[in-house]
Amino acid sequence: MAARTLLCRKTLSSVLRNDAKPIGAAIAAASTQSRGLHVFTLPDLAYDYGALEPVISGEIMQIHHQKHHQTYITNYNKALEQLHDAVAKADTSTTVKLQNAIKFNGGGHINHSIFWKNLAPVSEGGGEPPKESLGWAIDTNFGSLEALIQKINAEGAALQWLGLDKDLKRLVVETTQDPLVTKGASLVPLLGIDVWEHAYYLQYKNVRPDYLKNIWKVINWKHASEVYEKESS
């Protein structure tokens, strides 16, 4: 019963549709759709790959989006299809084994879908400091925006999250490779920064501090503020 519930739950409802799937992914999706299963697809970006330059190169953005993110989606759909078959056959062993693949690849899909929305070109407000409610909350919980940035940059590994703990009614900083909700059901992601090497190495090589220093120039605080307003009300 738990496996059937997991299969049917739309945990990635915030992901946008993308019609330009790679050929291999499109074939796999068509096969899965013919069996009546929901297929997750690569979300479109709200900006061009080169729009975040010079902070993040167009080459990195294209590879990160079309290759890394797409791989998570492909493997997630594959795992869900295998889960469907295992449940139909009452294969408990395979059902249990697939949970890690579902969590890892589904989590990668969630994380990257959030990350893209957390970025914006400078010409579209990227880097502009948060105002009003979120700005006040940051000052209250961390002292200042600069102090928050220093705290996140000091961690500098995996995925760095600024989240809202709805139970404690405060902002928190967390480091994890999984979606923030796996660390607590009351945690809502406001801002996620990908600090894995694939997000910066082609451009910044092994100088990760420079990547962390510069990425704040294209952070979409407007989007983070909108999520905060909705979730804190």
Swiss-Prot record:
Keywords: Manganese, Metal-binding, Mitochondrion, Oxidoreductase, Transit peptide. Its main location: mitochondrion. Binds 1 Mn(2+) ion per subunit. GO terms for molecular function: manganese ion binding; superoxide dismutase activity. Its cofactor is Mn(2+). It is an enzyme of class 1 (oxidoreductase). It catalyses: 2 superoxide + 2 H(+) = H2O2 + O2. Residues 1-36 form a transit peptide. It comes from the Eukaryota. One of its GO terms (cellular component) is mitochondrial matrix. Its EC number is 1.15.1.1. Belongs to the iron/manganese superoxide dismutase family. Destroys superoxide anion radicals which are normally produced within the cells and which are toxic to biological systems. Homotetramer. This is Superoxide dismutase [Mn], mitochondrial. It comes from Pisum sativum. The gene is SODA.
